[in-house]
């Protein structure tokens, strides 16, 4: 038999699990009718407990199917809440219990349904359990017989046991006494023996002195013989050591000779190589027809080859030491040469820097009058092109944006400091040369370097008016203090080339 629960409330499942434990029946819970119907059809031995909330959700077809299965088995219990007593979906269930209910109430209902004896299994029984226990105990006591006889037998047993215990104790005491007596007797015997030994010793002393003299002479003879034997024994090892000394000298000489031979002779690896060569030569010689002649002729070159190999290897060993020394000395020379070259390069670099500075100064002095002539030639061009001025002036939004040279030309004035400013423009790493300037700057900064081809291209595309404007903007952006800091320890070289105009231009 198994309890099958059709329920979706977890509290009810816990309550019925506790009831199933008391009934010692397994329980299975199903939330959906399809699973429940499949389980009910598998086995007919079950007790169905259904909840009205799940029964309300069933279709007409499912409810009719469930009603048929319940009617066949006749082991079904329905739980319902207040107000659902007369609902049609509760029809067919044999037992109905109202919610909420206690587990004991459900237990009683299930016990009645299962046909078990409620009086035996319920916790609140009519009979007192102590009465049942007493009845059973009296029945057992009647079978045991007279208690008085047992009570009389127990003291008799005790009296019988007591004398046996006393006898055992007495026996143990007697044994201990006997052991003590034996020990005392042994001690007395030992003492008597000691006394007898003490008495015997003076009697031995009273013996005649002749025995003592004889014993003394024998002792002396023994000592003399021992003394004689000792020097003989000492002489023997001395002779042995003397014999060993020349042997040691010979061994040392042999070792020295071996060392010399080993130094002169080739190493083990070399000997192996020589042996391999000898074997190869012997194999080659054995293959010939005349073995005896070839052996004699082969031995001579073999000896020669061995001697040559030995001499070559000894020479190689001797040469290895100076080679190592020469390698070390060569490495040291290379290092010193590298240091010297570095020093020379360091010393040459400032000279290279100083030479262009002096050349730049000379070129600068020559170029200043050229600039003046170029500027003089530029002024009539500016006068001849009043349209360009007007277009440029039209582009300026305010008077402040008009550069000073344009204003000066418009007013008919010349700027005398312009030539000086052109000569004193510093060379910075961030200054980018305009492609229309024919200026080559050589300074200590290595990043701004131009090839002569680039110079020629820049010369071809140069225009004097834009040159003046760029210089003027640069001078505006720099203050006097920044000019001073930039111009310190720096030189500027400007190269201007005059070329004939091409006929196409």
UniProtKB/Swiss-Prot annotation:
InterPro entries: Chtaxis_ChePep (IPR049800). Disruption phenotype: Deletion mutants cannot control the rotation of their flagella and swim with abnormally frequent reversals. GO terms for cellular component: cytoplasm. Transmembrane segments: none annotated. Interacts with CheZ; the interaction is essential for each other polar localization. It comes from the Bacteria. Its main location: cytoplasm. Residues 154-403, 420-465 are annotated as: Disordered. NCBIfam families: Chtaxis_ChePep. Plays an essential role in chemotaxis. Regulates flagellar rotation through the formation of a complex with chemotaxis protein CheZ. Plays a major role in colonization of the stomach. Residues 172-263, 289-311, 337-346, 359-373, 386-398 have a biased composition (Basic and acidic residues). Keywords: Cytoplasm. Residues 440-451 have a biased composition (Low complexity). The lineage of its organism: Bacteria, Pseudomonadati, Campylobacterota, Epsilonproteobacteria, Campylobacterales. It is found in: Cytoplasm. This is Chemotaxis regulatory protein ChePep. It comes from Helicobacter pylori (strain ATCC 700392 / 26695).
């Amino acid at each position: 038999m198994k309890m099958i629960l059709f329920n979706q409330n977890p509290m009810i499942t816990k309550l019925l699990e506790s009831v199933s434990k008391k009934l010692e029946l397994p329980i299975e819970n199903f939330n959906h009718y399809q699973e429940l119907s499949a389980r009910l059809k598998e086995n007919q031995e079950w007790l169905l407990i259904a909840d009205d909330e799940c029964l309300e959700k069933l279709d007409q077809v499912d409810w009719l199917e469930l009603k048929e299965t319940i009617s066949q088995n006749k082991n079904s219990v329905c739980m319902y809440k207040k107000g659902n007593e007369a609902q049609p979906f509760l029809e067919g269930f044999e037992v109905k219990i109202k919610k909420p209910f206690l587990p004991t109430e459900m237990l009683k209902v299930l016990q009645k349904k299962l046909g078990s004896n409620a009086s035996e299994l319920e916790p609140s029984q009519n009979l007192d359990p102590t009465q049942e226990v007493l009845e059973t105990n009296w029945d057992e006591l009647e079978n045991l017989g007279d208690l008085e006889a047992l009570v009389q037998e127990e003291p008799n047993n005790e009296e019988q046991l007591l004398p046996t215990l006393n006898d055992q104790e007495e026996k143990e005491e007697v044994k201990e006494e006997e052991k003590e007596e034996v020990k005392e007797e042994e001690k007395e015997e030992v003492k008597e023996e000691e006394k007898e030994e003490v008495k015997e010793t003076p009697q031995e002393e009273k013996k005649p002195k002749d025995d003592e003299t004889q014993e003394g002479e024998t002792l002396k003879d023994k000592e003399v013989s021992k003394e004689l034997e000792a020097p003989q024994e000492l002489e023997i090892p001395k002779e042995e050591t003397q014999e060993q000394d020349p042997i040691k000298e010979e061994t040392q000489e042999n070792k020295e000779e071996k060392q010399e031979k080993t130094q002169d002779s080739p190493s083990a690896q070399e000997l192996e190589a020589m042996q391999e060569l000898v074997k190869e030569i012997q194999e080659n010689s054995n293959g010939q027809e005349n073995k005896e002649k070839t052996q004699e002729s082969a031995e001579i070159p073999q000896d020669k080859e061995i001697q040559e190999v030995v001499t070559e290897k000894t020479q190689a060993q001797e040469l290895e030491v100076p080679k190592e020394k020469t390698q070390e000395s060569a490495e040291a020379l290379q290092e010193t040469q590298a240091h010297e070259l570095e020093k020379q390069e360091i010393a040459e670099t400032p000279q290279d820097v100083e030479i262009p500075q002096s050349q730049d100064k000379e070129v600068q002095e020559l170029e200043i009058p050229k600039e003046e002539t170029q500027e003089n030639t530029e002024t009539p061009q500016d006068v001849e092109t009043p349209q360009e001025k007007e277009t440029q002036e039209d582009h300026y939004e305010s008077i402040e944006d008009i550069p000073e040279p344009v204003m000066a030309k418009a007013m008919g004035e010349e700027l005398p400091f312009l030539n000086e400013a052109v000569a004193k423009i510093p060379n910075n790493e961030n200054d980018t040369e305009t492609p229309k300037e024919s200026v080559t700057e050589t300074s200590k900064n290595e990043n701004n370097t131009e090839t002569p081809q680039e110079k020629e291209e820049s010369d071809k595309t140069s225009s004097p008016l834009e040159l003046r404007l760029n210089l003027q903007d640069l001078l505006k952006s720099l203050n006097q203090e920044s000019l001073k800091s930039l111009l310190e320890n720096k030189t500027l070289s400007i190269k201007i080339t005059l070329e004939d105009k091409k006929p196409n231009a």
